[in-house]
Regions:
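Extracellular/virion structural assembly segments
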Residues: 2-13, 25, 71, 75, ...
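Residue-level recognition of well-ordered beta-strand positions that form the cores
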Residues: 6-8, 65-67, 153-155
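A general secondary-structure signal for short beta-strands and their flanking turns/coil
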Residues: 2-4, 41, 59-61, 147-149
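N-terminal ordered "arm"
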Residues: 2-47
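Glycine-rich, aromatic-bearing surface loops/beta-hairpins
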Residues: 146-194
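C-terminal low-complexity, charged extensions that often adopt amphipathic alpha-helices
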Residues: 115-167
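Long, charge-dense
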Residues: 77-124
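N-terminal interaction modules that seed assembly of large macromolecular complexes
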Residues: 31-71
Length: 194
């Protein structure tokens, strides 16, 4: 990845950071969907430079970076256009070259923890054709599990359901391939850290 642009979420008393993340990431996701190839791969990856991993919880911070191999790829995305209705709440830099001195690389991937009794029961009920209450009994003994991974709450435009996009960071020493999902995430592709 040779080029990037950075989006900073601006502190604001009107809208909290979690709500702002939802609005910003929804717009970036829509822009990335427009750039998918026929195998649903995207040439732009995301990183969260202020991501902090803790034992009990982690945070995304207030910055988002978009990376691409070519400057024209980021120009084609046109992130400021996608974020225009949020211009009072975000600052978007121009396209810049990635610095030569890096701290390493990271993989930002989607994590789908199976923690919610309710979610598991809904899924079980729909798969096995039983009612929700019966399915919930199946998981009644399940202990509550705290997931420290940070997330962004998004709304599916196809199903109108709200869901959490859990984002896990893995630090690595070597770069790897450059294709990502329509969320800019990947289980194998890296982005530079600086």
């Amino acid at each position: 990845m040779k080029y990037y642009l950075e989006i900073t979420l601006l502190p604001n008393p009107v809208i909290n950071l979690l709500t702002l993340w939802s609005k910003v990431f929804q717009q970036i996701h829509l822009g990335l969907v427009e750039m998918q190839d026929n195998q649903k791969r995207v040439p732009i990856g995301v990183s969260f430079p202020e991501y902090i991993i803790g034992e009990k919880y982690s945070v995304l911070g207030g910055k988002l970076r978009l990376f691409a191999q070519e400057e024209t790829t980021l120009a084609r995305l046109d992130a400021p256009k996608w974020l225009s209705r949020l211009s009072d709440y975000v600052h978007c830099t121009g396209i810049r070259s990635v610095p030569e001195k890096l701290n390493g690389y990271a993989i930002f991937q989607r994590e789908q923890p199976k923690i919610s009794k309710e979610r598991l029961a809904r899924r079980y009920a729909s798969r096995h054709g039983i009612d929700y209450d019966s399915a919930l009994l199946r998981y009644s003994e399940m202990a509550h599990k705290l997931i420290p991974t940070p997330f962004i709450r998004l709304k599916s435009l196809s199903s109108d359901n709200t869901f959490c996009l859990w984002i896990r960071k893995i630090a690595v020493t070597e770069p790897s391939s450059n294709t990502f999902s329509s969320y800019g995430l990947s289980a194998t592709s890296t982005v530079p850290e600086f």
